[in-house]
């Protein structure tokens, strides 16, 4: 119950973050992480793998970039689809996944399209 409550609080707090203007360039993985993902991944809220924690990220990295990106887009356990930000493009989510995974030891290129 606590995990679900924390996830809902994180998702609700993300609604206050502004979206980029229409026609703007897609955000980088770092920009998405800092404005969306850090709310949970910086502190490990609801068992989210912490940013830079190589041990926690190792099995996720082993799943591969495409699989991990699909999971982030669809959501898993306490993490809602797109981290609770439906305004994010799939490209922006994939970029954030690469940024988080790279901080945990992956060597993935940031998706260009």
Could you say what each language-model-derived stretch is?
Residues 36-39, 56, 78:
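Residue-level recognition of specific faces of alpha-helices
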């Amino acid at each position: 119950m606590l995990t679900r409550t924390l996830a809902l609080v994180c998702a609700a707090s993300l609604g206050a973050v502004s979206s980029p203007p229409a026609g703007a360039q897609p955000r980088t993985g770092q920009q998405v992480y800092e404005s969306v993902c850090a709310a949970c991944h910086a502190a490990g809220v609801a068992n989210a793998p912490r940013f830079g924690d190589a041990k926690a990220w190792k099995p996720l990295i082993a799943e591969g970039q495409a699989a991990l990106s699909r999971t982030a887009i669809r959501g898993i356990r306490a993490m809602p689809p797109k981290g609770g930000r439906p305004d994010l493009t799939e490209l922006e989510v994939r970029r954030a996944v690469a940024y988080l995974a790279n901080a945990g030891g992956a060597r993935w290129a940031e998706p260009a399209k």
